[in-house]
A protein has these predicted regions:
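Bacterial N-terminal signal peptides
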Residues: 3-14
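A domain-start/cap signature at the N-terminus of enzymes
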Residues: 17-71
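Serine-hydrolase catalytic machinery in alpha/beta-hydrolase-like enzymes
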Residues: 69-152, 156, 160, 164
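Alpha/beta-hydrolase fold nucleophile elbow
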Residues: 166-177
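Short glycine-enriched nucleophile-adjacent loop
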Residues: 181-191
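A conserved short beta-strand
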Residues: 193-204
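The feature captures the conserved acid-bearing segment of alpha/beta-hydrolase catalytic domains
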Residues: 205-269, 273
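Catalytic histidine-centered segment of alpha/beta-hydrolase-like enzymes
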Residues: 273-280
Length: 299
């Protein structure tokens, strides 16, 4: 790739790597508990090979005959928080199109996020950052386990989920936000099992090696039939470090450069939305888009 792209990617990954702290209030009943007029839900549980992490996976199947090619399917990280954001009015909206199977991959917790587990599961080796002035240092988390988690996902969770379902493998998609977005981006770079990748507000500044920088030598042939969507808001939350607007521009230029090399990559920019606000907006956009409908308004 061009020297301009190399410099642009480098600038993005040397930008400040602040991590937003998620809301960790216990969740109430979700749509699977309440029931839906449009989808039916099942659950499975899994344990990591080392016994350290424990997963709860919700599968939502439309009460509608699958298309001839099979249902689209969207695997969604941070599944506890995803399930908390779904309601029957939105599922009805999906039902009006070609509704996807929804697979929400969460953890065996009452909280929206298992911060320690996701820090390991969703990340490559990460940078460490000195705390900003006036901010307490966060306790260190174990990171760098994305290859291990991806193996569990693609070799166990996906085959078991799809065993008795008619799925269109070309419409097998994955979505993640923040650390989850970083996981999705790295999975795309490694041309994994999925055909469609939705990377929302990826925590790019945290990686020791940028997944995009590592993509400079990608062979476009390996990515034939694969699509990457980069979703980011341009709003700045209080206390967020400077440089976000420059990072957005770099991300846009990166998308253009990758697309010019024959890769199917799109950048969706959401005016005024902050990192945290992008969680719900991006998951709804991905589900709508996969159902054949227009994603929520973006540029």
């Amino acid at each position: 790739m061009s020297g301009l792209l190399t410099l642009a990617i480098g600038a993005l990954f040397y930008s400040s790597g602040s991590i937003a702290r998620p809301d960790l209030q216990p969740l109430g009943p979700n749509i699977a508990d309440k029931g839906s007029a449009f989808y039916h839900f099942t659950q499975r549980q899994y344990d990591s090979a080392d016994g350290e992490r424990h997963y709860r996976v919700w599968t939502a199947v439309p009460d509608k005959t699958p298309p001839a090619a099979g249902y689209p399917v969207l695997y969604m990280l941070d599944g506890n928080a995803v399930m908390d954001k779904l309601d029957d009015a939105f599922l009805q909206q999906l039902f009006a199109g070609s509704p996807p199977v929804i697979v929400a991959i969460g953890y065996q917790t009452a909280l929206p996020f298992d911060t320690a587990a996701r820090a390991w599961d969703y990340t490559p080796p990460l940078k460490t950052h000195e705390p900003r002035a006036g901010k307490p240092a966060l306790p260190p988390r174990k990171t760098g386990g994305n290859d291990v988690f991806r193996q569990l996902l693609t070799e166990t969770m996906v085959p078991q989920t799809e065993a008795n379902l008619k799925i269109d493998p070309h419409q097998r998609a994955i979505w993640g936000h923040s650390y989850g977005g970083l996981f999705v981006l790295d999975a795309w770079r490694k041309a994994s099992l999925f055909g469609i990748y939705y990377s929302a507000s990826p925590s790019l500044g945290q990686a020791l090696q940028s997944p995009l920088q590592a993509s400079q030598s990608l062979d476009a042939v390996r990515f034939r039939g694969k699509s990457l969507y980069l979703l980011e808001g341009d709003g700045k939350a209080r206390g967020e470090p400077s440089g976000h607007e420059a990072s957005l521009e770099v991300l846009r230029q990166t998308q253009q450069q990758l697309a010019s090399k024959g890769l199917t990559v799109a950048f969706w920019r959401y005016p005024g939305l902050t990192h945290g606000q992008m969680f719900e907006v991006s998951l709804r956009s991905a589900l709508l888009h996969l159902s054949g409908q227009a994603a929520l308004a973006h540029q």
